[in-house]
Amino acid sequence: MKSKTNLDDLPVGITLGDPAGIGPELAIKIMSDQKIPRSKRLVFIGNLWALNETAMVLGVELPPLNLIHRPEDSVIGFNFIEPKVVQKPNAFRLGEVQAACGKSAMEAIEFGVKGCLA
């Protein structure tokens, strides 16, 4: 007999979306918001360079992130998965549409959906 899964124990996946959009900034705000429960397994999905680039522009330091390969490897706190590394465009600029950024967003969404269906 299969045991029931406690939904409170499951990781929560959050995709960064387009690296040139507001997704990375929202992720950073989530990480810095003290009202967000630190007792959950939050898994951010995207390209780490996008998060680092946005933190640099905002002038903030990222909190420690647990870099993982699979959602089931997540721990309580902030986790990060790069499903497929998409190289940062040479002329990357926040707020501008770029093919590589769209590809990065799609990779993150596909990975997140597959994780939900597993």
Model features per residue range: what roles?
Residues 1-118:
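Contiguous, glycine/small-aliphatic-enriched amphipathic segments in soluble metabolic enzymes
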